[in-house]
Amino acid sequence: MGILKRHKSYLLTILFAFISFVNSTSLMANDIHQLQNNNIKEMKKAKIVFLITEDPDNYEAHKTVPRFAEILRKEHGYDVTVLLGSGDRGSYSYPNMKAVSKADLLVVFARRIALPHKQMNIIKNYLAKGKPLIGIRTANHAFTARDKIGEGFEDWPEFVADILGCENRGYGPVGPGIDVSVVSENANDPIVSNISPSRWHSEGNIYLVAPLLDKKAKVLLTGKSNDITQPIAWTRRAGKSKVFYTSLGYPADFEMPEFKTLLLNAIKWTLK
């Protein structure tokens, strides 16, 4: 009997060892599989397309955006394309607009332009698919042309209300700049939660947009210029598209850590 008990104990020990080995091997396989999935995700970098204009009144977007895009590429691994168009405002066009159709995120920092019908339709179709958009500063009159519109071109003034959820109601004085504050009730929002300090100063003049047309928009930042206070950054939904807009974007803003963090967080939020 003693020999049988010892033999049974020996067999149980071997069995438990085998089960442990199988479990550990399975866990290792799962870990390897997870790493492979992560590597695949890393290989599929999100495609971001910026639409910008070189315009004396467009706050040097043709200089600031390419530099910021390089940060997004080198430090954050995004696949970034910056499209700078050409032509008069009433007959403006971009090269390689097919990039917008393939983009995961479209960022607009353009001012008062009309585009060829086909190019405007690319933007509209992009949004109709529920893809996200970020608007910077002059985006709140990006496609509201004032110049004579050329034959075969079109503007899209409804973009401001329908997509950004606001109206362009004018501008505040240039001199005092803007005292920027995170809205306290939304301070935990991922777009602003890690911005420190939560108050800073922008050299740009304030855009007048209050009250927002979209009453459900989530205001993240307000700006004060003299006695004028306005929402200056918010999120909303345009159909199924996530939208972030900020009226910041003055050239000096792109040198400020707070603003760059704001844009980076907004990019992450829209792509999530």
Could you tell me what each predicted segment is?
Residues 31-47, 74, 101, 227-230, ...:
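Extracellular ligand-binding/catalytic regions of CAZymes and related secreted enzymes
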Residues 33, 73, 78-79, 101-102, ...:
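Catalytic beta-strand/loop cores that center a nucleophilic Ser/Cys/Thr
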Residues 47-142:
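Helical hinge/lid and interdomain linker segments adjacent to catalytic or ligand-binding clefts
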Residues 51, 112-193:
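A glycine-rich, often tryptophan-bearing local segment used as a flexible ligand/cofactor-contacting loop or short
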Residues 24-29:
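Boundary at the C-terminal end of the N-terminal hydrophobic targeting segment
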Residues 13-23:
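Bacterial N-terminal signal peptides
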Residues 56-61, 90, 228-231, 253-256:
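Short, solvent-exposed loop/turn elements at domain surfaces
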Residues 2-14:
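Bacterial N-terminal signal peptides that target proteins for export
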